Amino acid sequence: MRMNDGGSPPPRIGLVLGGGALKGLAHIGALKALEEARITPALYAGTSIGAMLAAAAASGMTSAQMTERARRFRRKDLFRINHVGMIMERMQSPSIYLESPLRALSDELVAEGTFDDLRVPLLVTAVDLENGMPVVFGRPGLRDVRVRDAVYASCALPGFFPPGVVGNRMCIDGGTTDNLPVNIAGQNVDALIAIDVGIADVPAASGIASQGFATIFMRAAAMMMHNQQQFALENWTTPPMLLVRPRVSHISWFSFAHKEELIKIGYESTKDALRDLDTMLAAKGGIYPRRAVHVVVDRVACTGCGLCVARRPDVMALDEFGKAYPLKPKCDFSPADGAFVRSCPVNAIKAQPVIADEETIRAATGEYAAVIA
């Protein structure tokens, strides 16, 4: 919660931490920024590493304690090859890596007990491997299970780690169906703060096929999750949401060499976005921060494929020559509104910041990039 100066009840703010493998260390910086702003979430929700750190926060761990643990975090603390399984069971082995290191990490960060034992409500997403349906641990009927078991299951990336047993369910990584669980967290709160470190964008890359199984798998998974997530965000209504997207696309999913950088990026991105917190809290819905941009189309490059119109018919249309044009050249963009620009197959669409004063100049040089990233 965030205290109001006027003495009125503080708004109930839910915090959502998305999945993103080791990029999720940026969540630690985000939590630090929230602590400094004296924002205490009324509810936590998370997927994968976001679930682990959300559970740690709900267990009472501070960002400083998380930072200290992250600095000691080594590759062998997470990845130990399942040699026996790979040799003896071959294709029937459940995973490349052993369960025990990930399980030990979950046990270290998350308090013992069930969801009813936590000081703050927590929602952890996973997927039931047998029926293919998403599961939200912490919801009524799914609270009497060990939080550590739910967190492990939410982090159990298929093929990398064995599925986790939670109660009588066999579960895998929640990011398989919902990498940023804003929909499940948006109930019974007045506003949301969502930290998306995983799949805000899938930047163009070359040579992927030669970089091995893990790189190919994670890129394919990122494409799938990006499209699922973008649909949810483009259709978002209520409650109002502050969407923070730290710029971490240049860092690989499993890099141990950028821990401090990730924490710093998460901190700075969240601190910057929090300048719009009061505006977001005063709104009835929508996604923030919002910035004015000009949408410009290169008519020579435009092929008239209509993809931009299909994605954003409220913003784009085709003229009598079959070329795309903006219905409103000046638009009010949130971090979730740039997908139709990036999806243009010939890069004919640009969204340029409206430069009007010092504030928008600053946005153009830094914040604007984060808004449409």
List each language-model region with its residue ranges.
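Ferredoxin-type iron-sulfur electron-transfer modules in oxidoreductases and energy-metabolism complexes
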Residues: F321-C331, G338
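Residues immediately within or flanking Cys/His clusters that coordinate Zn2+
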Residues: R299-C305, S334, G338-V341
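Iron-sulfur (Fe-S) cluster-binding modules
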Residues: K350, A356-A373
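Patatin-like phospholipase
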Residues: M1-T47, A55-A310, A348-A351, V371-A373
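Secondary-structure transition/turn motif
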Residues: P140-G141, K328-D332, T365
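Iron-sulfur cluster-binding cysteine motifs and their immediate structural context
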Residues: L307-F321, A339-A356
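Extended beta-strand/beta-hairpin segments
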Residues: D319-K323, E367-A370
